[in-house]
A protein has these predicted regions:
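Glycine-rich FAD pyrophosphate-binding loop
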Residues: 22-49
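Short beta-strand to alpha-helix junction loop
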Residues: 62-68, 108-128, 137, 265-268
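Glycine-rich Rossmann-fold phosphate-binding loop(s) that bind the pyrophosphate
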Residues: 9-11
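N-terminal glycine-rich dinucleotide-binding loop that anchors FAD/FMN and/or NAD(P) in oxidoreductases
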Residues: 44-72
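Central helical "cap/lid" subdomain
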Residues: 158-223, 285
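N-terminal FAD cofactor-binding segment of flavoenzymes
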Residues: 61-89
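Conserved flavin/dinucleotide-binding core of flavoenzymes
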Residues: 4, 13-16, 24, 45-47, ...
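A conserved short coil-to-beta-strand element within the FAD-binding core of flavoproteins
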Residues: 138-153
Length: 367
């Protein structure tokens, strides 16, 4: 198959890059290892049997319009509805299991954070609709990238081992640098570049999220905003992510136990421990969720590498390809981690994709 441009990854950055190339009239293909689009944007509806009309984000969730105006502008352009994070009420602080959590007036964050009506999947779905279906190849894990004359050849492998080859003149890396470093490059990329990529933290990689959905809005009845900070766990940071006008409560928490420790118990046991914590915090109203989910990003091979489990979480910008060597003008990193301003954030995915595609169109693309 031929295409002027090959995008590796169908997360936010890859999909947005596709829409920009589509508008520019450039031939392209998007190769995605997973059997779905969205990358680190993931809804509970995709995970398992979410009740109709309810959307819960198991991955990237928030944006900050005041400091991320380009992302906010895209949300507006796509006709999506921002939801302010939080609601009126007190927050809780859990110090120990032997005494009730303490209530405090909730503080107002600045800048204010927002979610999207319909979850962040509303964003990826809107971007996907702007791309012809045949240009997105799911279940195509890239295993190697080779220089081929003046062009490039990309080899992929499906879950069943079926291989495919794609050729183009440029590759956009819309996946975490640590995952890009696991691919085979022929000729080899400079080791200093690969080493830097391997050590670049992947945002979300160490995290696990738990979400519980309830049939009643008990937070309002208890005059709570849903924000909790806990020194007990297993969840150390908890937020209300309910959608307006549903009459339901959706609560999510970051599980604070390190990945290799939480893997010593079953998912069912981890869910039980999370439910017990919610009962301690909110009472028997939280004992029996209508639905519950856990997404452990550390166990996702298309997100996390062993390096991610060995280092602190952070926002570190990886190196791009050296401009003077044989790979010059052949590869561009556009995943969120490559954003100089919002590395690791949703806005960073838009920022890096816009910068990378714009530079290629202005300075590299053949007329």
């Amino acid at each position: 198959m031929k295409g002027s441009v090959i995008i590796i990854g169908a997360g936010v950055s890859g999909l947005y890059a596709g829409t920009l190339l589509e508008k520019a009239g450039v031939d392209y293909v998007i190769l995605e290892a997973r059997k779905r689009t969205g990358g680190r944007v993931l809804s509970g509806q995709v995970l398992a049997n979410t009740p109709d009309g309810v959307h819960v984000d198991m991955g990237a969730t928030w944006f900050w319009p005041e400091i991320q105006p380009d992302f906010a502008h895209l949300v507006h352009q796509l006709g999506l509805t921002p939801l302010p994070q939080g609601r009126p009420g007190d927050m809780l602080y859990e110090r120990q299991t032997t005494s009730p959590a303490q209530r405090y007036p909730a503080y107002v964050t600045s800048p204010e954070s927002f979610r999207l009506q319909g979850g962040m999947q509303a964003l990826t779905s809107a971007l996907t609709r702007q791309i012809p279906a045949q240009k997105i190849k799911s279940d195509h894990q890239v295993v190697s990238i080779s220089l081929l004359g003046e062009g490039m050849q990309v080899a992929t492998q499906s879950e069943t081992g079926e291989g495919s080859l794609f050729t183009g003149e440029h590759v956009f890396l819309a996946l975490p640098p640590a995952l890009a470093a696991k691919m085979t490059f022929e000729p080899a990329l400079p080791e200093r570049v690969l080493s830097h990529w391997r050590k670049t933290p992947t945002w979300m990689a160490p995290h696990a999220k738990y979400v519980a959905l309830y049939q009643t809005d008990f937070l309002q009845a208890q005059h709570l905003c849903g924000d909790v900070s806990s020194r007990v766990g297993p969840m150390v940071e908890i937020h209300d992510v309910s959608e307006p006008d549903t009459g339901k409560t959706a609560i999510f928490g970051f599980i604070g136990v390190p990945a290799k420790s939480r893997w010593t118990v079953s998912e069912a046991e981890l869910k039980r421990l999370c439910r017990e914590q919610l009962v301690r915090l909110f009472g028997e109203d939280a004992a029996e969720p209508e639905a519950e989910w856990i997404k452990d990003w550390a166990a996702d091979p298309f997100t996390t590498t062993e390096f991610d489990l060995q280092q602190d979480v952070g926002h570190a910008q990886p190196q791009q390809i050296p401009a003077q060597e044989e790979w010059a003008d052949k590869l561009t990193g556009i995943a969120s981690e490559w954003s100089p301003q919002f590395s690791g954030y949703l806005a960073g995915a838009i920022d890096a994709a816009a910068e990378g595609v714009g530079h290629w169109l202005r300075h590299v693309a053949r007329p």
